[in-house]
């Protein structure tokens, strides 16, 4: 079917091509997705890049754990070796006696009389 000398499918594709920019969107999505580019290309994924690929991970610096998560280096020096199913340090308790100054309460100095006071109404 001809519409002013142009086939209808070609007219429709031309409209979508100009208005929606479909080929550019597909090219952009394919070229910038992770894992599609090869290491020789300039947009290849780098370990210093985050998912955006702008190098923000490199600018922020690399942070790695130096010990077992949840265990301080002091805990390892005390002789406690972390076990796979071990509880966190704050739930284990102290390895040394606490120096908080805990003192038992003073004994009561006054004693209670067992007999009622004279003149009390006893029923």
Curated annotation (Swiss-Prot):
Could you tell me which residues belong to the region Disordered?
56-123
Superkingdom: Bacteria
**Which residues fall in a compositionally biased region of kind Polar residues?**
93-116
Q: Which family does it belong to?
A: To M.tuberculosis Rv0007 and M.leprae ML0007.
- Name of the protein described by the UniProt record: Uncharacterized protein ML2630
């Amino acid at each position: 079917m001809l519409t002013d000398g142009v086939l209808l499918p070609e007219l429709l594709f031309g409209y979508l091509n100009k208005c929606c920019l479909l080929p550019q969107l597909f090219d952009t999505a394919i070229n910038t997705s992770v894992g599609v580019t090869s290491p020789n290309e300039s947009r290849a994924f780098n370990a210093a890049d985050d998912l955006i690929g702008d190098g923000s991970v490199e600018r922020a610096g690399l942070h790695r754990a130096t010990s077992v998560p949840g265990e301080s280096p002091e805990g390892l020096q005390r002789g406690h070796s972390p076990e796979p199913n071990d509880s966190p340090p704050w739930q284990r308790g102290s390895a040394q006696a606490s120096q908080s100054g805990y003192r038992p309460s003073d004994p009561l100095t006054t004693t209670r009389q067992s007999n009622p006071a004279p003149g009390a109404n006893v029923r």
